[in-house]
């Protein structure tokens, strides 16, 4: 191993090249060589490819194009069937031995063209639309990749313990902050650093232009790491040693100047769900096409759509798991098309066929083959389940295990290399499966007698390979490639650089990696933002509806406001809320955070700078916010009776608009700086509360500066305070308010008007009028001289927020670089398991234990597992279905998704459900499992000839395609939860737990049974999904939807083999499967094959080696080629319009008229007749749920408590908010005195608790929504637990944290403010605080229980906040309410009663002492004292207040309140309200809880809509009309 880094002696001799390519010539297809003006007759040898007629002569582009029509079929044959290189005698001889297969596949290739609507990929590529070509027709961008001695370093990620609530709380006091700081300033990191290990070890090789390399290895072996390294995506690695070059360009130069030319297509499909397929592709091309070439964009889009068979989805939303859009397979094709739209020269594809059926996967691979050949691209692919047809399309293969290179070389030599080492390849195994199995100690097989001598570990296999001739050939090729570059003076590379430079816009620097200028990037992102707005019309309309509603509500509350002094304070309130309500919505945070992964990928593709997105959102904000502000300001301004002077209105409009823009920018800044959406909501919510508190409305400016010694400075950094001063001074400037009669002091008989004062701050002695400017100066210290200064300050804040956002978008990256290691719960057993599982092999999600194919260890323990299998609950009942049809509403009509499907499931029978993407496989499973929630299902589904009973769903297991679990539970906890709640209620609990032990043992999950499910890899989660269903002992049938999707071939085989054992033990199984290998399909007994539209084209036995299926199609003139995968043959045959006697075969009709179908129908009828005669055993009472409701509730409550404990962000967020708001509230109003302003501050201090719900509800709603979604999707359909248990558990789990949060908030707020310390008052307020925290939790839950979607909830929440904030008698006194609101809204507002109760408890004990400026000043008539003149007024007319200086003869001062009781009466709070309000508020809390139960049952279980469908029906008609108008415009634009 010491010589690993030494290059073996490389020869420049042509013969040393393992591919027989002359060193000085290009490695190209013979077919393509005809298009080069520099080719010789050696390029078109005896194999007779392109240019045969002109052999020996240079072929011109014109001549080649004249021959193109005749030649393109030959190119297709060359491209698709691996007889590519005329110079490769070994490959040619191999192809010549397969004449029959080639003939058949040529016929299928021609049918492929018909299937794609006549689209010819070769012709399209040769046309030069997707990339530039030379005058000779050659691709202008040709770049090969060479890598020498590459070692990739990664941080060691061992198994760890789950982070719990105490860990999060302790982390707040330093450790978490320290980690964040060290992330950006590594020099501050002290102590032991995490160890660094090799992810890849000493890789060398070359992939030349026009070549395809298949990278094979099990998940975690290093395949994704290798692809990312080649794609120059190194951010997630600790370091990369060695050299990677791209046509002679260094990795550094490539990343800096040509980043978009080398791309990595990740496994997951991340797109903006509200964009259509056409918009997604157009956006990609806009950013990769300069203005001069923009006419080619529609042509390329059309070609890409045809290429991948998704033309019909052109105007369909891409969608995701929450937004309905294209299917999963179609979404994968969109991802592929988007990557091709980058026009890159080197592309690395990471498991891009996941979710595609075998036929589509093969079509995709063929398309890559053609593009690689014709465009001379360099292509690297990793596939987990590669069929032989796909493997034969590859030039090279690289086998990786544990980060080590086991083989690299020609694909057609790999199998023999390992056979020569002593490995055995089973006859039915594909080459890719065989090569992958070498990495699995439990799956690989050795030749008899060579078990000991054959190398086994990754290190041994690597060492053997590096001593082999194949490794020397690698170095020969690397040296030959480098010599070629040197001899040609890097001609191709220089042409590549020149072509890339020419493809850029004129305004873009030639050294920039981007194609278009920042202006065009922003313009494209602006267009996309408008598309996103229009694509989510429900949210858009909901938002504007709420805005208009809030405007009407606010203005109606202040409608008819008096112009005299009595309306001064309320007018200030109206202005305050008018600048506040538009910024209450935190909906901007979600898209800003959730789209990060997409933006990061687009940055790697060199589409645009991340800052372009931030700038584009600002640009879109201008019209979007304008459209929000216009209706709102018009409604509020004129309905509240503000000054109708034009200049004042437009100034008001300007500040509302600017403020909304500013705070929206603030939200985006927090989103850009926050790692998660939870953090963004938390910090933005806290910031909003601080802005409201320190705006100068709750506490006047001077009070903040002088009295709030800790936080008063926040007034100066608060943009809302400047806006509030501006709109307030704008309204009150030049306004003179006459004193309201009720505010004249004194009043009554004998009072001389000349000796009266006005009870409003700012009034002057002896004057009955009050100047608005003086009122503002005295009350708020506001002046209109600051108007335009304030405008400039708000603009400055906006610019600051935008700058921080733009910089953060460019600098910060919160996108993870791969999966993590296993995470365990804290226990003694898991401590040992953690130590065993601390090592991994890749920066990807590693296979820690329970590795792929671990189930293959069944041979070692076959006896014990066989006995355990026999103990599984087997049934002799038979499930039959006949003429099943399923129809759903579609547009103005209906669409049939299943059409007359027949079949049966017997014990011991394993049925494969197959079909192309969108054929209806999952639909059929859901229909048979009685899980459809909409549409009409017809047909007969019977068990033993009898109708399905209430226990049917409980007697079946259903494994979803998506592994839906509580991600915070451990494997054992999930299985025990399923077993206890789903097995028969009469089974002892210990017996159920013992059964779980058997399942864990059978599934080989012992070593990771205490691992958190959220940390598992794909294959482990799939086994847990199966285990959860097996733990329920399904007595009838086990449904599985794509159990092998996303798994490598060995993991897929292990899963299916385990299912086979279950089937042999008596379990009936119906399983959908996408890409079964030959070995995989042989595990099934029967196959039910569907075509699109839910039409059956075959149902029957597979037969040994697929003979029964092959015979069925052979009888109809379609012969399966020898060694062809039967599953692939079925799908490909059904997908293509195969010719028979000059006509196209309708396979659906063929099946309906076949003898096999008649036999199946007869058998179903026979089963029904025979089984229906068997008497039904008396089972007693049939229960919908196996476990009693009490057991369901207790177990679910325990699980939810564990979930909140192990996912601390939820509980921690509540504690964090309580602490922060409590501190700000308590210490801002620190130890209030007894003045009137302090009484007002007491009132607002109590009132400020309503600032907590907007933050808390934004965390309650997502948590409840996620749990509700899991219950609706899996746990309720499986009848694990019912609606009552779900509601009760969610309600109970909120109570402890509500009490703790209330206690923390109360301690930090109540005593610092200086409220009464007697136990009666303090205890009562704590009790009310606890009820309030319980109220807000249940409030959020019932809203979420009722609302149809999370988006609607987010937009509706502000409406509720407005209602409870306004109609409680604080913002506007109850006596001034308009009649419409006065007699109902005030009383149905729960917050009203909370405020009245708390105020009635803490106010009465306060004796008020007026400050001089708070008293009303007036002079008594000459010769009278204040008491003599105004005593009667105070005692009999006013009945409240007192004279500060009764004996004075001038400047009398009247204090309007003598104590807190008199003050609270103005708030409509009475002496006896205390316990009455407690009882009423408690009733509201109970009603909230009742509503949770009510809406979950009625809406989620019963499906009631409460007329919402009719309400929005008219809106839907209007929307459709608008859509038609815009769709016509869109079609014109696309054409």
Swiss-Prot record:
Pfam families: ABC2_membrane, ABC_tran, ABC_trans_N, PDR_CDR. Its main location: membrane. It is a multi-pass membrane protein. Glycans are attached at residues 33, 149, 274, 287, 351, 892, 1459. Residues 46-76 have a biased composition (Basic and acidic residues). PANTHER family: ATP-BINDING CASSETTE TRANSPORTER (PTHR19241). The gene is atrF. Residues 1-115, 834-868 are annotated as: Disordered. ATP binds at residues 915-922. Belongs to the ABC transporter superfamily. ABCG family. PDR (TC 3.A.1.205) subfamily. Pleiotropic ABC efflux transporter involved in the basal level of azole susceptibility. Confers resistance to voriconazole. Disruption phenotype: Leads to voriconazole sensitivity of the yap1-mutated voriconazole-resistant strain. This is ABC multidrug transporter atrF. It is found in: Cell membrane. One of its GO terms (cellular component) is plasma membrane.
């Amino acid at each position: 191993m010491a010589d690993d880094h030494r290059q073996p002696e490389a020869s420049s001799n042509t013969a040393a090249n393992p591919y027989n390519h002359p060193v000085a010539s290009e490695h190209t297809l013979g077919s393509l060589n005809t298009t080069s003006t520099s080719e010789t007759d050696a390029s078109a040898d005896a194999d007779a490819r392109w240019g045969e007629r002109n052999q020996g002569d240079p072929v011109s582009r014109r001549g080649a194009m004249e021959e193109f029509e005749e030649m393109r079929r030959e190119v297709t044959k060359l491209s698709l069937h691996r007889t590519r290189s005329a110079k490769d005698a070994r490959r040619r001889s191999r192809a010549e031995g397969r004449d029959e297969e080639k003939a058949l596949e040529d016929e299928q290739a021609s049918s492929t063209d018909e299937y794609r609507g006549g689209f010819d990929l070769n012709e399209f590529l040769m046309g030069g639309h997707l990339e530039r070509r030379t005058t000779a027709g050659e691709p202008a961008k040709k770049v090969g990749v060479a890598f020498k001695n590459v070692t990739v370093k990664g941080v060691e990620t061992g198994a760890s313990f789950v982070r719990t609530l105490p860990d999060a709380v302790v982390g707040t006091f330093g450790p978490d902050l320290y980690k964040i700081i060290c992330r950006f300033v590594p020099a501050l990191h002290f102590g032991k650093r995490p160890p660094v290990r090799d992810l890849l070890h000493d890789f060398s090789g070359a992939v030349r232009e026009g070549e395809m390399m298949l990278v094979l290895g099990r998940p975690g072996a290093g395949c994704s790491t290798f692809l990312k390294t080649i794609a120059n995506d190194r951010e997630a690695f600790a370091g990369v040693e060695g050299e990677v070059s791209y046509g002679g360009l260094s990795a550094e130069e490539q990343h800096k100047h040509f980043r978009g030319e080398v791309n990595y297509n990740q496994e997951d499909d991340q797109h903006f769900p509200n964009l259509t397929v056409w918009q997604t592709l157009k956006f990609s091309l806009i950013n990769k096409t300069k203005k001069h070439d923009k006419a080619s964009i529609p042509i390329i889009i059309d070609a890409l759509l045809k290429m991948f068979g998704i033309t019909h989805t052109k105007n369909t939303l891409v969608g995701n798991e929450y937004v309905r859009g294209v299917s999963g397979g179609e979404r994968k094709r969109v991802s592929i098309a988007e990557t091709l739209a980058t026009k890159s020269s080197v592309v690395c594809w990471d498991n891009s066929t996941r979710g595609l059926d075998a036929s589509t996967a093969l079509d995709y691979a063929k398309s890559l083959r053609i593009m690689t050949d014709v465009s001379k691209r360099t292509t690297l692919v990793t596939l987990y389940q590669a069929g032989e047809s796909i493997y034969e399309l590859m030039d090279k293969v690289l086998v990786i295990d544990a980060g080590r290179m086991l083989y690299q070389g020609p694909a057609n030599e790999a199998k023999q290399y390992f056979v020569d080492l002593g490995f055995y390849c089973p006859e039915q195994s594909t080459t890719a499966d065989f090569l992958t199995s070498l990495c699995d100690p439990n799956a690989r097989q050795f030749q008899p007698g060579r078990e000991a001598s054959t190398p086994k570990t990754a290190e041994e296999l690597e060492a053997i390979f590096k001593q082999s001739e194949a490794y020397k050939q690698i170095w020969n090729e690397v040296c030959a490639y480098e010599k070629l570059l040197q001899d040609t003076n890097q001609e191709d590379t220089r042409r590549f650089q020149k072509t890339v430079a020419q493809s850029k816009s004129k305004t873009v620097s030639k050294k920039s990696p981007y194609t278009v200028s920042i202006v065009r990037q922003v313009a494209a992102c602006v267009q996309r933002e408008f598309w996103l707005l229009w694509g989510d019309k429900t949210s858009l309309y909901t938002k504007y509806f709420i805005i208009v509603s809030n405007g009407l509500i606010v203005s109606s509350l202040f409608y008819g406001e008096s112009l005299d002094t009595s309306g001064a304070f309320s007018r200030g309130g109206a202005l305050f809320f008018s600048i506040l309500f538009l910024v209450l919505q935190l909906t901007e945070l979600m898209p800003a955070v959730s789209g990060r992964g997409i933006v990061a990928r687009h940055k790697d593709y060199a589409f645009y700078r991340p800052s372009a997105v931030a700038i584009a959102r600002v640009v879109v904000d201008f019209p979007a916010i304008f459209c929000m502000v216009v209706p709102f300001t018009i409604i509020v301004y004129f309905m509240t009776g503000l000054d109708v002077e034009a200049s004042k209105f437009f100034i008001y409009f300007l500040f509302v608009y600017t403020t909304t823009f500013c705070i929206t920018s603030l939200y985006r800044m927090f989103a850009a700086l926050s790692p998660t959406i939870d953090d963004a909501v938390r910090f933005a919510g806290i910031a909003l509360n601080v802005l409201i508190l320190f705006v100068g409305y709750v506490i006047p400016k001077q009070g903040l500066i002088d009295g709030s010694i800790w936080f008063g400075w926040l007034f100066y950094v608060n943009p809302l305070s400047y806006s509030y001063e501006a709109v307030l001074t704008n309204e009150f400037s030049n306004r003179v308010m006459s004193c309201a009669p009720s505010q004249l002091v004194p009043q009554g008989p004998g009072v001389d008007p000349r000796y009266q004062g006005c009870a409003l701050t700012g009034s002057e002695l002896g004057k009955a009028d009050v100047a608005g400017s003086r009122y503002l100066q005295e009350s708020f210290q506001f002046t209109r001289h600051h108007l335009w200064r304030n405008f400039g300050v708000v603009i400055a804040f906006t610019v600051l927020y935008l700058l921080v956002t733009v910089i953060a978008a460019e600098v910060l990256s919160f996108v993870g670089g791969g999966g993590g290691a296993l995470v365990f719960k804290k226990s003694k057993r898991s401590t040992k398991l953690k130590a065993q599982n601390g090592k991994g092999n890749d920066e990807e999600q590693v296979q820690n234990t329970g590795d792929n194919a671990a189930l293959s260890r069944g041979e070692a323990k076959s006896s014990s597992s066989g006995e355990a299998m026999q103990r599984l609950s087997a049934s002799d009942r038979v499930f039959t279905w006949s003429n099943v049809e399923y129809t759903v509403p579609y547009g103005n009509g209906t669409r049939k998704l299943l059409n007359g499907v027949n079949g049966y499931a017997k014990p011991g029978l394993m049925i494969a459900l197959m079909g192309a993407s969108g054929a209806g496989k999952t639909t059929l499973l859901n229909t048979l499992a009685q899980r459809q929630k909409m549409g009409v299902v017809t047909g007969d589904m019977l068990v033993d000839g009898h109708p399905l009973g209430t226990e049917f769903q409980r007697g079946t297991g259903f494994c979803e395609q998506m592994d839906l679990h509580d991600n915070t539970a451990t494997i054992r906890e999930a299985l025990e939860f399923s077993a206890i709640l789903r097995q028969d209620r009469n089974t002892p609990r210990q017996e159920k737990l013992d059964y779980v032990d058997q399942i864990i043992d059978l599934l080989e999950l012992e070593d990771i049974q205490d691992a958190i499910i959220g940390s598992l890899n794909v294959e482990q989660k799939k086994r847990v999904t199966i285990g959860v269903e097996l733990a329920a002992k399904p007595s009838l049938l086990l449904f599985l939807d794509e159990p092998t999707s996303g798994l490598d071939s060995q993991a897929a085989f292990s899963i299916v083999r385990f299912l086979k054992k279950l089937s042999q033990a008596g379990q009936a199984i119906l399983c959908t499967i996408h890409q079964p290998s030959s070995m995989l399909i042989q595990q099934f007994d029967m196959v039910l094959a569907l075509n699109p539209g839910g039409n059956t084209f075959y149902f029957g036995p597979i037969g040994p080696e697929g003979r029964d299926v092959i015979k069925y199609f052979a009888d109809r003139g379609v012969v399966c080629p020898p060694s062809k995968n039967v599953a692939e043959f079925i799908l490909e045959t059904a997908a293509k319009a195969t010719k028979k006697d000059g006509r196209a075969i309708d396979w659906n009709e063929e099946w309906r008229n076949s003898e096999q179908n008649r036999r199946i129908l007869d058998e179903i009828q026979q089963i029904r007749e025979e089984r229906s005669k068997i008497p039904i055993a008396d089972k007693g009472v049939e229960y919908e749920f196996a476990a009693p409701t009490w057991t369901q509730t207790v177990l679910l409550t325990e699980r939810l408590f564990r979930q909140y404990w192990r996912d601390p962000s939820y509980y921690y967020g509540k504690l964090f908010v309580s602490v922060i708001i409590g501190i700000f509230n308590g210490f801002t109003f620190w130890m209030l005195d007894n003045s009137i302003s302090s009484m007002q501050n007491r009132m607002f201090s109590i009132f400020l608790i309503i600032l907590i719900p907007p933050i808390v509800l934004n965390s309650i709603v997502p948590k409840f929504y996620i749990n509700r979604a899991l219950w609706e999707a899996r746990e309720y359909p499986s009848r694990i637990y019912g609606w009552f248990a779900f509601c009760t558990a969610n309600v109970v789990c909120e109570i402890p944290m509500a009490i703790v949060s209330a206690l923390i908030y109360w301690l930090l707020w109540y005593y610092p403010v200086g409220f009464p310390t007697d136990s009666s008052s303090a205890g009562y307020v704590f009790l009310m605080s606890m009820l309030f925290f319980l109220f807000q939790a249940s409030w959020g839950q019932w809203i979420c229980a009722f609302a149809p979607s999370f988006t609607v909830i987010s937009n509706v929440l502000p409406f509720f906040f407005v209602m409870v904030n306004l109609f409680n008698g604080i913002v506007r006194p109850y006596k001034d309410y308009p009649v419409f609101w006065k007699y109902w809204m005030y009383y149905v507002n729960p917050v009203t009663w909370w405020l009245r109760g708390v105020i009635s408890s803490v106010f009465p004990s306060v004796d008020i002492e007026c400050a001089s400026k708070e008293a009303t000043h007036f002079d008594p008539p000459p010769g009278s004292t204040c008491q003599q003149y105004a005593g009667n007024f105070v005692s009999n007319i006013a009945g409240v207040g007192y004279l500060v200086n009764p004996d004075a003869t001038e400047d009398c001062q009247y204090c309007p309140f003598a104590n807190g009781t008199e003050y609270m009466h103005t708030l409509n709070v009475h002496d006896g309200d205390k316990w009455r309000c407690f009882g009423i508020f408690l009733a509201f809390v109970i009603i909230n809880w009742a509503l949770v139960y009510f809406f979950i049952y009625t809406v989620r279980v019963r499906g009631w809509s409460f007329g919402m469908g009719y309400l929005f029906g008219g809106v839907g008609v209007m929307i459709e009309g608008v859509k038609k108008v815009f769709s016509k415009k869109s079609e014109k634009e696309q054409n």
